[in-house]
Every structure is written in structure tokens, then in C-alpha cells.
Amino acid sequence: MAQYQLPDDFFFGAAMSGPQTEGQWNQGGKLENLWDTWSIQDLGSFYNRVGSYAGNDFMAKYQEDLRTMKDLGLDTYRTSIQWSRLLDADGNLNEEGAAWYHELFRASREAGLEPFVNLYHFDMPTYLFDRGGWESREVVEAYAHYADVAFREFGQEIKYWFTFNEPIVEPEQRYQEGVWFPQLHDFSRARTVQYHISLAHALAVANYRRAYDEGAVRADAKIGMINCFTPVYTKVNPSEADLEAVRMTSGINNRWWLDLITKGELPADVLESLAEGGVKLPFRAGDQEILKQGVVDWLGCNYYHPTRVQAPASKIDQYGLPHFADEYVWPDAVMNESRGWEIYPQGLYDFGMDCIKNYPDLEWFVSENGIGIMDEYKNRDAEGTIQDDYRVDFVRQHLEWVAKAIAEGAKCRGYHYWAVIDNWSWANAFKNRYGFVEVDLMDGYKRRLKKSAAWLKQVATTHVVD
């Protein structure tokens, strides 16, 4: 088996989020977010009726988890501040919430881990959703204020900041595909949400730059965005209509955000096609100047699977709204049957090559990558250890393609695995387990290393992928 050497300064870490791990959802002054509200109103929408309440009990077990991450050879990890924990309903600092994050960041430094901090991970405070959510300019301004409070409260503690995790997902899952609460099917409203998130990002970056200039943020800090930059593919011998489907899918999902964070603008061809399709974005005078402030220092790329599309059978969907692409099922696809996702490690290499071609100055890292397996407990051996060689194979293959991309000039600086410790995953709850570390829900959220943990430690320590 071939060996691949990653650079000595290539970092390894864990990816997680506040709403998926922290627990204590209504303690310490925390307000409800949409996941809490949906759990209260319709617990049956969650796998095995496990709602948002406990996460993986991280607030009670953070010291143990930080030690475990360090013991596995990691030197960084990413989490998120919960908007609904940091601020009260008047936009003022919740001192108890702030104290928790100060303690977490202190303990992280003590453990020898550099925390990467994201400000938003699909966790809109419910009271703001009731005011219109991301369809409202008021909420855009509220987010910019929240970001400013966070930068100034933790600015001397945090080196790496991120405005959003996967900003394309809420427009799709909540407003377009009807998967998450409020379970809407409205392509046009989804694009309004996407546009307003773009403005919120840019306003947050502007607040960060201002705080930086005023010395409220440490001098070596960087700010970025994290998105699922999923390469878009089509048939081997595509028609012009197939290529048009690729252009629009990649344009909405990928180029929209890449152009925003590198150029401070949105792709003109995508905006033109949306307008031709009858999608009216809520442009206002001065918006272009706001978007220009959205350029960041670097980028996180979440990657689990590719996107494959073909020309749509109809350009209007069943709800009478624009439809730019149908799914294309590649006959040679290797699937993770638990998740229904294609496993295609080359996608990370292709993303790196696209950056070299179209965004040559952009530094990035793999901010999420992982494999979730259903009923993983069935793979437990006689000693109680989950045998998960499939996880080793998955990560090895992806890291091999990362190493190839770096060797060809990609500016990829590190790798965060999702999620090193099993965590709660939205409506799927604990259906699919991702971790190198098991969380036993039947035994007080007890942590146990899986077989793959030893391999992770070896790779993170040696930077050799074999």
C-alpha cells in the first residue's frame, strides 16, 4: 500500500457544533433555538424521538473530551457558539453563557488544543425566527450585532473565526426541500434566505475587521467561512442542457459563496439566470457595498459526497417554481448505504484543483469529512470495541487525495474530521454514528474508543497516510 506524506505544518482536528454537542438546552439563560422548538412541538420527527436536548452531553464532559482529542494526536478542533446561549432576547450578553465559553476556551488552551470558533450552525433563536428569520433584514442586523458581541467578548482568546457553517444548507433544507422545520417547498424564498445570509456574513466580516483594527481581536487572528463545497458532475458525454444544469447547481451551491468570500460579489450569471426564471431577490440600494466587505482570510471546505446532476425533465417543479437540474445517478457509484451518500474521495482533489484555477490565492482546509454508519453497535467485538475498519478506509482514501492536491499546489492547510466523538445529528439524531469515539446513550453518554481511534492517532502524529 502506497504511503502519502502530509506537510509537517498540516493540522489535524475535530469538527463539532454547539447545538449538536452541548446539551443543557434550557439552562444558564439559554433561549430556545429552532431545534429545541421543533423537538418540543414534534418529537416524532426525530429518529427514535431523540430531540435536541442533550447533544452528546459535552457541557458535562468537555474536560474528558478535550483530553481525548489531545490523546488522539489532534491539535485543533472546531465548535460553535450558540447565538441563543450568548445573547438574551434583547441582544444583551448573557453572562452565564459567556462564562461557559470562556471556560471552554481556557480548558482548550490548557489541553493544548487550538479552538476554531464558528458563529452559526443552523441554530436560529426561535424568537428571531418568529420575526421572519433569514427572510427578514431585522434578523440580518441582529446577526451582525451578535457577531460583533462575540468578537469583542472572546477576541483575545480565539485565533480562528468563522461566520457560518454551510450557509447553503438552511435555504435548501428549511425552505426548498421541506426537510427541516418549517418544512417549506419554495425555491424563491430559499434564494431570499440565501441572499440575506450573504449580507449577514458580509456585515459580520465588516464588524470583525473593525474590531481587529481597534485591537479587540488578537493580532494573529483570521476569519473565514465554512461551506459544503461539493463538486458538481454530470454524464460522461453530456448535452448542453446537462452542462447548463451543472453551471446553475454549482453556481448556487458553490460559486455563490466562493465569489462572495474572494471577490465580495455574487456570480452575475447565476443572478441573471435566477431573474430569468422569475426569482426576485430582495436587492436594496447599498447592498453591493455591503457584499464587498465579505472577503475573508481563508475557507473551510466540508466534503462528504459529490453532487451529480443532469438536465431537468421540467424547468418548473411540482410547486410551480424554477427547477434547474435533476439528480443524475452514476452507475459506478460506491455508496454508504447507511446515509445514502456516494463515496467519492477524488472530490476533494477536484475542489483543490478548482481553487488553483479559479481562486488561486485562497487558503483552505477540510473542515468536515466523515462517514456515518447506522446500527454501528452491531460491529462490537467480544471486548466491547466497535470494529470500524470502514472508517479507516474512508478517511485514508480522502487524505490520499488531499495529499495529491497539495503536491500539485493546492493550499490546503489541515483536516478536521466530523465528528471525532459521536454526536447528535439533527432530525437523524444518533441514527448514523460518525465518531472515532463511541457515545453510549444507554450508559450515561459514556465514551469508548472505537478500533479506528488508534489509526487516527498514528496519522495525526506522523502525518503519514498509509
Predicted regions and their residues:
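Aromatic- and Gly/Pro-rich amphipathic surface segment
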Residues: 32-67, 72
